[in-house]
């Protein structure tokens, strides 16, 4: 429910960048025939990626205006080749355009006026015959066919603020920041624009397919305007984009699936219309226009350029519909170019994606951030011998030397030179970084995003601010204060602690942990910590042994029924971890702990040991964890990393060995646990989240060390718990659980009139648990007769939820409706419940 996680950073960055804003909103000039130099009329003039011409000229002169940025004009007239002009403040007037009948044009998105033809069935559509041949000859990325390959990648990400006016400049927030408007562009319509962020990066890519599969993407150089030390801004910039393959059936934007117009299922979503044959970089190509059959679903519109001989995709344009139902997003536009070295493969050439983002409003005139990412792929080399050491991680890769490149390097590295406005971003933000007021604004949003307030002079973060207050039956009102060391985003060590006080039990609680990473390559780390606290155990199966790991200590302010099943925990932990391979971690924990009931009158953890009755469970154990995150991407190289949004799975295998007699431990036991979690895109039907867990205690242990099927008696959303289970209702020596949660992204509700205007999104879920509990495990506990496992039947819950509740682009509320499927004869159960919470995502 809390929103202090890296995946929520886009929400905060939109709020920040909405204050700082580049625009050119008018352009004029003359159009002539390139051969005769005579003026031409009847020319369609298109602004940016618009599907409709802004004007059709009646003379050789033209003038266009727009409420948004004009960065490109396209000119088209029958029997003439398309001409494109990039617009900057310097060339926006007196543009001289020459149209030629003989020029071979690059890929461009234009509209040739024609009605959408109607066919009795798709087989009558000539575009269908073409697409069938595209599917039959579906190409694979050419990199897969070679034994080895290398190529360079230049990436540029730019944020421009849009749709500002003179009144905005006069706001108090810009007091003492007026100098930023020296970089503005004023237009005839009175709007103002301002560049706010620029990031450039150069990568060397290496790959080997045979004899073994290896890849490496090496960051060679990076240059960021003013935000090198701001984790939120840089992470957000990188986190907006995903790699896509136009031949896939589903394209991933923001981890949301959009049907691909080139996918084999495309005709179920799109109408296709063969427009013409055109020349694309010297190749003859079919130009096919596609439109979604329904504009209120997640889909694109645009053009496909298909080679007339090989039926390869030479290029494509993808533009979102006006009714796009994605939070914080007003529009998406992508241009793709491919090279086709042979009849079976393709190679990426250039990808350009623009995303228009607003934190609140969907209106076209709303103040927004236009985020543009362009990637150029070049210098392909194939079957060149590559040494094994190239694929090995080295310490140099994790240093900051890639930020030390001089201006001369960047002039050579860029495929195209920077515009005047792009160069101004570096200068402006360097000045902003020296301005106290700007730094205070950045700190505010960084605090909201990270959950910590940084005291830079001391190198300390205070927080997390979202855990300051809590309430439970034992402690009553609870105040928690914490801090951690934080000097830079790449700190190799961290010390953190917290202290808490309950006004009902009048007890002080605390926790502290120190960690040090010795090697950035294999992330070899040692850590130690201790805590004394009141916790809600039994709400996680595959839990983390770390002292500062997420717990359910006292965050339940509103709950159904009395929650008396809290435990008092004294715990000390030592651990070491290493990543021998990328995204694969081996961790060994040694833990000594004592557990007793924090509320003996309402909740018993008493058990029998050698005929004696005991109330405290003393435990010493070692835990070996194998954690795999294939495909995960991270920012920073320090002790704490920030994860980019991906569909990477999480796979965990844990073995725990309890040792009797070690530091007074009461039990020998062996436990094995497994966890698998992964989100799957299911075409245009949304995203399915799968969470499977299984485990077994091989020995008899008391309740404090048992596997508890996680319940949730709060009214808040809690991932991977059972909403209608009470705490400790099911206890198991052996267990399996499965959680399936499908997000339809509004697919079903979009069919319902009136309701679809609300842009709500539906969720369906089902959860199940099965387990066994031995008689010995029941007998060891004083109140063992109360506990049982879901053995007779698989316990299950089901329900649906509504997410995306809110207004405009601010739709962060979710409500779930849960039903208990069986075991309905038990006392004090709840058969139906409502959970709610905040969920900040796209």
Language-model features and meaning:
Residues 111, 116-285, 291-299, 361, ...:
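Structured extracytoplasmic
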Residues 37-41, 63-70:
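Short Pro-Gly-centered beta-turn/loop motif in secreted/extracellular proteins
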Residues 25-27, 34-49:
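Short, ordered, surface-exposed loop/turn motifs in non-cytosolic proteins
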Residues 47-49, 74-85:
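A short, solvent-exposed loop/turn motif at the edges and junctions
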Residues 95-114:
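Conserved "repeat-terminator" motif of extracellular CCP/Sushi domains
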Residues 50-61:
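Short, acidic Ser/Thr/Gly-rich low-complexity loop/linker segments typical of extracellular
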Residues 27-33, 60, 97:
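A short, amphipathic beta-strand motif
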Residues 256-258, 382, 391-842:
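Exposed, low-structure sequence patches enriched in small/polar residues
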């Amino acid at each position: 429910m809390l929103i202090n996680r890296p995946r929520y950073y886009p929400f905060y960055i939109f709020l920040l960048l909405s204050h700082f804003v580049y625009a050119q909103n008018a352009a004029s000039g003359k159009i002539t025939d390139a051969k005769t130099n005579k003026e031409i009329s009847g020319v369609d003039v298109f602004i940016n990626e618009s599907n409709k011409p802004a004007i059709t000229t009646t003379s050789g002169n033209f003038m266009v205006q727009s409420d948004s940025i004009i960065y490109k004009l396209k000119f088209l007239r029958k029997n003439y080749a398309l001409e494109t002009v990039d617009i900057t403040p310097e060339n926006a007037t007196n543009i001289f355009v020459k149209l030629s009948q003989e020029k071979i044009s690059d890929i461009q998105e234009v509209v040739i006026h024609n009605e959408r033809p109607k066919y009795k069935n798709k087989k009558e559509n000539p575009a269908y015959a073409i697409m069938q041949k595209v599917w039959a000859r579906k190409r694979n990325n050419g990199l897969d066919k070679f034994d080895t390959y290398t190529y360079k990648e230049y990436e540029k990400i730019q944020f421009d603020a849009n749709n500002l006016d003179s009144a905005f400049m006069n706001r108090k927030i810009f007091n003492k920041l007026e100098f930023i408007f020296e970089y503005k562009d004023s237009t005839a319509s009175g709007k103002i624009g301002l560049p706010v962020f620029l990031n450039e990066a150069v990568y060397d890519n290496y790959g080997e397919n045979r004899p073994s599969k290896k890849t490496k993407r090496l960051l060679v150089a990076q240059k960021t305007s003013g935000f090198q030390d701001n984790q939120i801004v840089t992470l957000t910039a990188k986190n907006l984009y995903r790699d896509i393959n136009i031949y896939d059936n589903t394209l991933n934007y923001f981890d949301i699936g959009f049907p691909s117009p080139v996918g084999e299922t495309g005709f179920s979503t799109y109408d296709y219309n063969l427009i013409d044959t055109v020349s694309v970089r010297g190749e003859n190509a079919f130009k096919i226009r596609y439109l979604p059959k329904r504009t209120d679903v997640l889909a694109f519109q645009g053009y496909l350029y298909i080679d007339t001989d090989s039926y390869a995709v030479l290029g494509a344009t993808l533009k979102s519909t006006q009714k796009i139902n994605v939070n914080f997003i007003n529009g998406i536009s992508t241009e793709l170019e491919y090279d086709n070295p042979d009849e079976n493969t393709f190679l990426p050439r250039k990808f350009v994606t623009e995303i228009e983002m607003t934190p609140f409003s969907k209106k076209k005139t709303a103040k927004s951030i236009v985020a543009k990412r362009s990637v150029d792929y070049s210098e392909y080399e194939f079957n060149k011998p590559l040494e094994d050491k190239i694929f090995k991680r080295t310490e140099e890769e994790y240093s900051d030397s890639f930020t030390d490149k001089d201006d001369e390097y960047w002039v050579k590295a860029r495929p195209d030179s920077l515009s005047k406005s792009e160069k101004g971003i570096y200068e402006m933000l360097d000045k902003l970084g020296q301005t106290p007021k700007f730094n205070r604004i950045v700190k505010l949003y960084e605090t909201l995003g990270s959950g910590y307030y940084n005291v830079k002079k001391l190198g300390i973060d205070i927080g997390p601010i979202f855990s300051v207050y809590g309430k439970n039956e034992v402690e009553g009102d609870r105040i928690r204060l914490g801090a951690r060391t934080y000097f830079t985003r790449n700190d190799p060590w961290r010390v953190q602690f917290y202290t808490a006080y309950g006004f009902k039990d009048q007890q002080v609680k605390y926790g502290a942990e120190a960690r040090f990473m010795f090697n950035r390559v294999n992330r070899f780390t040692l850590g130690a910590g201790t805590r004394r606290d009141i916790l809600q155990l039994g709400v996680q199966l595959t839990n983390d042994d770390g002292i500062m790991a997420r717990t359910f200590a006292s965050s339940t302010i509103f709950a159904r029924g009395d929650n008396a099943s809290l435990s008092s925990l004294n715990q000390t932990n030592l651990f070491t971890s290493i990543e021998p391979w990328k995204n694969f971690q081996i961790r060994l924990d040694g833990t000594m702990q004592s557990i007793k009931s924090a509320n003996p009158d309402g909740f018993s953890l008493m058990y029998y040991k050698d005929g004696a009755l005991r109330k405290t469970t003393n435990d010493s154990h070692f835990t070996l964890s194998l954690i795999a995150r294939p495909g995960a991407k991270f920012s920073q190289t320090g002790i704490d990393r920030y994860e980019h949004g991906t569909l990477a799975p999480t796979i965990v295998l844990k073995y725990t060995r309890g040792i009797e007699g070690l530091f007074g431990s009461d039990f020998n036991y062996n436990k094995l646990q497994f966890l698998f979690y992964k989100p799957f895109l299911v075409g245009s039907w949304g995203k399915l989240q799968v969470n499977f867990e299984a485990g077994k205690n091989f020995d008899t242990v008391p309740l404090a060390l048992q596997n508890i099927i996680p319940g949730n008696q709060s009214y808040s959303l809690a991932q991977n718990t059972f909403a209608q289970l009470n705490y400790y209702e099911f206890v198991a020596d052996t267990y399996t659980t499965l959680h399936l949660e499908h997000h339809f992204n509004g697919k079903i509700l979009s069919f319902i009139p009136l309701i679809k205007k609300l842009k709500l999104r539906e969720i369906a879920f089902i959860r199940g648990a099965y387990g066994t509990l031995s008689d010995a495990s029941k007998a060891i506990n004083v109140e063992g007769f109360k506990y049982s496992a879901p053995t007779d039947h698989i316990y299950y819950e089901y329900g649906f939820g509504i997410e995306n509740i809110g207004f405009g682009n601010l739709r962060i509320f979710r409500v779930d409706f849960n039903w208990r499927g069986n075991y309905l004869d038990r006392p004090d159960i709840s058969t139906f419940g409502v959970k709610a919470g905040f969920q900040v995502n796209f």
